[in-house]
């Protein structure tokens, strides 16, 4: 995919850089693989705001994406590549030999007409899924399970990938984009290749309205608020906040480590923070 820039006939087009999606399918999604999606506006079941700066945006329908690749050893053909408003990656509509349709995450270098398959002993080619124990060391992968049968959780956003760098006592060693090295069971499935739409990292919205179309409201800084609204608020003139960055509720933020899942610490061989030293 290439990037598109525009002749600035309006101010909003001067900085605008978007992904060229001309090669994607232009029709509607498959009705049996979609369902309605209601906009929550960052509210919970009590109507209270639990996620700030969300709301509005274009209406969406949710596409059921198969992260488990549940149909094993049945070849499928890629019917088309589609845009999905619920994720940064593109999705591929595949048709199995028995006629069943399914959506999967589209990897890079997957084209219409290609054949994909999920199974224990399949070729190493983009879109094919197999257990980590059956892959050669060095393979670039995405949509990696953390527990066998749970469905892919690691490396699912646009351009993301992990690399199989070794094996150890029934576990596979993965290097993630963040620099973290992690142990995952060799029985976990993963898909070969990197996720599509790597140019997503280079887009520029060009205007505030394009963020609003996505359901993002203005992100107000604490130093621009009053003391009643934020610990950084108030002061005469412009201030730096006067203290280390905190959330509106006084909790340290911006770099403060929040990981507290000690049960899974044993699966992290090298943290993402170590490469920064």
Swiss-Prot record:
Keywords: Ribonucleoprotein, Ribosomal protein, RNA-binding, rRNA-binding. One of its GO terms (molecular function) is transferase activity. GO terms for biological process: cytoplasmic translation. Transmembrane segments: none annotated. The keyword Nucleotide-binding does not apply. InterPro entries: NA-bd_OB-fold (IPR012340), Rib_uL2_dom2 (IPR014722), Ribosomal_uL2 (IPR002171), Ribosomal_uL2_bac/org-type (IPR005880), Ribosomal_uL2_C (IPR022669), Ribosomal_uL2_CS (IPR022671), Ribosomal_uL2_dom3 (IPR014726), Ribosomal_uL2_RNA-bd_dom (IPR022666). Pfam families: Ribosomal_L2 (PF00181), Ribosomal_L2_C (PF03947). Coiled coil: none annotated. Residues 222-277 are annotated as: Disordered. GO terms for cellular component: large ribosomal subunit. It comes from the Bacteria. Gene3D superfamilies: 2.30.30.30, Nucleic acid-binding proteins, Ribosomal protein L2, domain 3. NCBIfam families: rplB_bact. Belongs to the universal ribosomal protein uL2 family. One of the primary rRNA binding proteins. Required for association of the 30S and 50S subunits to form the 70S ribosome, for tRNA binding and peptide bond formation. It has been suggested to have peptidyltransferase activity; this is somewhat controversial. Makes several contacts with the 16S rRNA in the 70S ribosome. Part of the 50S ribosomal subunit. Forms a bridge to the 30S subunit in the 70S ribosome. This is Large ribosomal subunit protein uL2. It comes from Bartonella henselae (strain ATCC 49882 / DSM 28221 / CCUG 30454 / Houston 1). The lineage of its organism: Bacteria, Pseudomonadati, Pseudomonadota, Alphaproteobacteria, Hyphomicrobiales. The gene is rplB.
